[in-house]
Regions:
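Hydrophobic transmembrane alpha-helices of multi-pass small-molecule transport proteins
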Residues: 45, 103-104, 113-134, 152, ...
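Helix-helix packing/entry segments at the starts of transmembrane helices
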Residues: 75, 90-96, 161-186, 224-264
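Transmembrane alpha-helical segments that form core, pore/gating elements
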Residues: 45, 101-102, 137-204, 300-317
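C-terminal-most transmembrane helix of multi-pass membrane proteins
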Residues: 34, 38, 133, 218, ...
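Specific transmembrane alpha-helical segments of multi-pass solute transporters/efflux pumps
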Residues: 12-17, 46-94, 130, 224-242
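Specific alpha-helical transmembrane segments that line the substrate/conduction pathway
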Residues: 32-43, 79-118, 151-152, 245-263
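Membrane-interface helix-cap regions at the ends of transmembrane helices
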Residues: 19-22, 40-59, 123-139, 183-216, ...
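Transmembrane alpha-helices of multi-pass small-molecule transport proteins
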Residues: 20, 25-73, 98-104, 154-161, ...
Length: 317
């Protein structure tokens, strides 16, 4: 049951960018799509926030960091990135997050890391060089790559904050953290995205998925209900039922699923070297994630993929 839920979560998370990109290409600003996703999911998760309202008093810094970095920061950077580069490439760049976390642990906190973790970092960086085709002078939009890297850095920012908070005597309920993170993220994004300036008429029309028209409201419904609410809930439940190693492997499947969906539904094809590089990135991320020190937050990070790897109990990356 746990493995089934983990696979459902990976598929749901993997489809977020594939559903969001047609809306962006139809005329919505990436920030507006992020706001719709986060605000809609926050509304659905509001009952959980009420149920866990004691978290506001017990862990305000953690909730603020989750909302600012893991929700608003990661999603804004990721959706802005996929408006400029392929979905699969953006997500694979995000998979540098576990490697960046280990870099922070080793060089800033000056805590030891294992040799296997160092190998994972080298693999992740080397694989990324293949994904972005450095030999061709970075064939992708530089700003798009920078935004994807920004999403990875936001995950590291949340790790740093939650790692400092992890000495607390009691771990908060992850669903409560998600609910408040979405509410805080929605509040921040409302100020930044200014949704009152959105072209709402786009949502009443259609968006093209590789030339096939799809109702915009269906894509939005997928992003909010499936790729956010259902993905988080199934992800949290599955992590509680699986070992950290299995959960980490399944989390890596999100990038594979997103790349395949983008290939089939959006026509975003990757070259053979990019596919090989993507496999190497995922292998490096998995090794880095599974070889990290034992001290870690147990709260999930918004967005899936490497964010979800950072949430696996018993790991720091």
């Amino acid at each position: 049951m746990g493995l089934t839920l983990a696979l459902v979560s990976a598929v749901a998370f993997g489809g977020s960018g594939v559903a969001a990109k047609p809306l962006i290409e139809a005329g919505l600003d990436p920030l507006h799509v992020v706001w719709l996703r986060v605000a809609g999911a926050a509304l659905v998760m509001l009952p959980l926030a009420v149920r866990h309202r004691a978290l506001l008093r017990r862990r305000p810094a953690l909730l603020a960091g989750f909302g600012l970095f893991a929700v608003a920061g990661v999603q804004a950077c990721y959706f802005a990135a996929i408006s400029r580069i392929p979905v699969g490439v953006a997500l694979l760049v995000e998979y540098l997050a576990p490697a960046l976390v280990l870099g922070w642990v080793r060089f800033v906190q000056r805590r030891p890391v294992t040799r296997a973790a160092a190998v994972g970092v080298v693999l992740a960086v080397g694989g990324l060089a293949c994904v972005v085709e450095v030999w061709a002078g970075l064939g992708f939009d530089a700003l798009g790559l920078a935004l994807a890297l920004g999403a990875a850095c936001c995950q590291v920012g949340y790790f740093v904050l939650s790692d400092q908070d992890s000495d607390s005597e009691e771990s908060p309920d992850p669903l409560g953290v998600i609910a408040y993170g979405l509410l805080i993220g929605a509040a921040v994004l409302t100020v930044v995205a200014r949704p009152w300036s959105m072209d709402w008429s786009v949502l009443t029309g259609t968006a093209a998925m590789d030339g096939t028209p799809v109702a915009a409201f269906l894509l939005l419904g997928w992003i909010v209900l499936v790729a956010t609410v259902a993905a988080y809930v199934t992800g949290v439940v599955s992590v509680r039922r699986l070992s950290p190693q299995v959960a980490g492997v399944v989390a890596c499947l999100e990038a594979v699923i997103a790349t395949v969906l983008a290939w089939v539904l959006l026509g975003e094809h990757l070259s053979a070297p990019q596919i090989v590089g993507g496999v190497v990135v995922l292998a490096g991320a998995l090794i880095a994630q599974s070889s990290a020190p034992a001290k870690t937050p147990e709260e999930p990070v918004a967005g899936g993929g490497p964010e979800r790897e950072l949430s696996t109990p018993g790991t720091t990356a």
